[in-house]
Amino acid sequence: MEKMKKILAMVLSVALLFSGMIFDNTVTKADETNTWSGEAIISPEQNKLIGAGYIDIKWNNTLENVKQYKVYIDGTLKKTMSPSGDIMKFEFYTTNVKGYTAQIVAELKDNTVVKSDVRNFYVTKKGICVNRKDMGAAVDPASMNIGWYYDWDYKSLKDWNYKNKKFCDLEFVPMIWGDDLVDISKRCEYANRKGYKYMLSYNEPDLKGESNKQPDTMRYRWNEMIDSKGSLRLGSPATETFQINSDKWWTPFWNGLNQTQKNNMTFIAVHAYQHYYDNADTALEYLHTIDEIYAKYKKPIWITEFAVADSGNVFNPKNAKHNAQVQEFMKIVLKGLNERSYVERYSWFDFNPEDSKTGASGIYYYDTGKLTTLGQIYANIGNPAGYNAKKYNVSYTTSKNTSMASCVAAVPTTVYSVTAKKKAFSYSIKSVKRAAGYQVQYSLNKKFSTKKKYKTKTKNISATSATVKNGTIKKLTKKKTYYVRVRAYKVINGKKYYCKWSKINKVKIKK
């Protein structure tokens, strides 16, 4: 009996020891899963403001016995992935300026489900361009709620150990810029090693003072970029004006590319300054040209340099009218850019606010980084709802409709002349770029009433490549006074859009 008691005691001790081991192991596993849940997602960082486009969700693959991961964005399943490597990555695309949530759900082989903590992040299109000479010396990009930047170089300010450290945590986009002592292949290799997603290419190759390349030479350079790009997404060469208006440089460059070369152009980088400003329609016309670029090339657009400035027109920062013009332009254009899903990113060019000719387009002072009123407007626009943005007490909204139709309707049509003839009149119209045709409307009523007695009629005429469109309207009533107006129309994505009516011309028909 005594022997039996000893045996039972030993069995009980072993059982207790074993159960303790199981309990300890269970606690360890629970600790591991809790730790993983809190530390799973590596990027984006919590509450981070990041640039629109392709976004990486990265997480640690440190849980044991994972069967598969599920990636959720805003609560919607986007991808199911098998575990592989130390760090997992899922890439998704968005140009919506808003806040997002990301969560990773791990399904283990024993059917246990482990969820990561929810990660909040915010997306903006807004960026900034700075150089190491003076533009980047003092400014804090966070003061304008910026999501990305570039510096006309393939190395970031951080890589250059630049004195202003406030750019260190901001997404950097490298640029080839032009021919350099460092080969294209080495610049692309460097960018890939750094983990950058994009590469801007040649800067204003159509200008002698910039990268200065002929279209045929640029095609060779473009091939070099394609051969060296690795995982980089390439932006187009940025001509000094809208590509769609660059007949002497961009058109021959583009037409000389084969389909593979075109396919490797992930986005079009636009440099386009507004050289004059009449009224709000000027800003809408600017947006219309952006629309036309996308309609023609079907590629996402980055506006990497823009402002209101011109060597011939002055925009003085001490002139209230000039300041108001630039501010109105910014409000309208930024509203339109943020609304357009095909616009991925934009960055305003900061002219020195102390320059008497271009300073009205300055958004911050080079020496102090202090924002101008225009800079405060820039800071207030394009911020996702819910983001803890820096806000400024300046008006930054506009009631202007910036839809495609409204932008086309801002494009003017000009009638050079209307001349009376025998039972007829002739007209001369200034050609509108990329017009599909024109409408000539004439009536005995200056308001163009459709009542029968006013004989209001509209004639459609086709567009030509000529700079002036001439024609004649016949079979009119002699000695009667007719009112005449003209408007162009465009066809974009198969739909007809009408431009603005011309001024009304009055003509009295001859006998």
Regions found by a protein language model. Name each.
Residues 203, 250-292, 296-314, 349:
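Aromatic- and acid-rich polysaccharide-binding/catalytic face
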Residues 191-215, 235-243, 263-276, 302-306, ...:
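Active-site groove signature of glycoside hydrolases
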Residues 18-34:
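Sec-dependent signal peptide cleavage junction
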Residues 32-63, 117-122, 390-434, 496-511:
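Pro/Thr/Ser/Gly-rich low-complexity, intrinsically disordered linker/stalk tracts
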Residues 96-108, 474-494:
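Beta-strand-rich modules
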Residues 121-156, 171-179:
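Boundary/entry segment of secreted carbohydrate-active catalytic domains
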Residues 173, 315-321, 336, 340-404:
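Aromatic-rich peripheral "rim/lid" segments of glycoside hydrolase catalytic domains that contact
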Residues 70-97, 439-477:
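Recognizes extended acidic, P/S/T-rich segments that occur
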